[in-house]
Amino acid sequence: MTSEDQITAAVERLATALETRVPCAAVRDLIGTDDLQAAYAVQQGLVQKRLATGAYVVGRKIGATSEAVQNQLGVDQPDFGYLLDEMDVSDETASSGGISMRRLVQPRVEAEVAFVLGKDVNPPSEEDITVELVRDAVDLAVPALEIVDSRIENWDITFTDTVADNASSGLYVIGKQGVPLSEVEPRDVEMSLTINGEERSSGNGAACLGDPLEALRWLAVQCYRFGDPLKAGHLVLSGALGPFVPFAPGDKVEASISGFETLTAEFKE
């Protein structure tokens, strides 16, 4: 069983890498490769450190929902992490001439459907959390670019490593024009992601656990079990629709997801 000292040491290792932008060794030497409870405890500790600096929770992200990304990461199940206000860089391409790479360690980018919740998802029992329930809780769907990142050197991760590292979260960009679910069916969307005009990733809604709304249901169950249910106003990044890809300073990334506005993000040093 993982000790509190080992959990604390893992939190400190990842927090230092996050603050210095210098990648660290994996934390599986401290928490093992099978102790998910310990991995999520490390994640909680890492998030609490950010909250202590004034950041606040705005939602959740679901990771490793597509087979392509699971293969890229070498994992076989999804996970989740927290979204903080400081991760939102939706306006930086327009306001600052690009998103600074100095905030990142080893970033990759992926396109996905995000959901803005209009209702809490906290029914009397876990069995009540159905796709129909979470669909009803969604206010709007929006296109998203997630800039995933790993504080662990060379992305040398097992499942517990990525969970501990807040599900390899980094930054995100979301569209300004939301679409109600009466106008778009998430599982049917098609996605193309280009870098400097060249397609680098493609996929569809069915690649995300069969349906992004199924991914949302899965997340709602996990949050319910952890005693921290999804709430009205939360943003949920539901998971990649295709493989994630690396990018560099000076790159222009565009994501086209059918039924949504095209998203553009530019990156600088």
Q: PLM features: what roles do these ranges have?
A:
Residues 2-211, 252, 260-269:
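Catalytic-core "active-site belt" of small-molecule-metabolizing enzymes
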Residues 32, 221-223, 238-240:
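Short alpha-helix capping/helix-loop boundary micro-motifs
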Residues 214:
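Glycine-rich, small/acidic residue-mixed loop/short-helix segments
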Residues 227-234:
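Beta-rich strand-turn-strand
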Residues 237-238, 255:
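A generic structural signal for residues embedded in beta-strands
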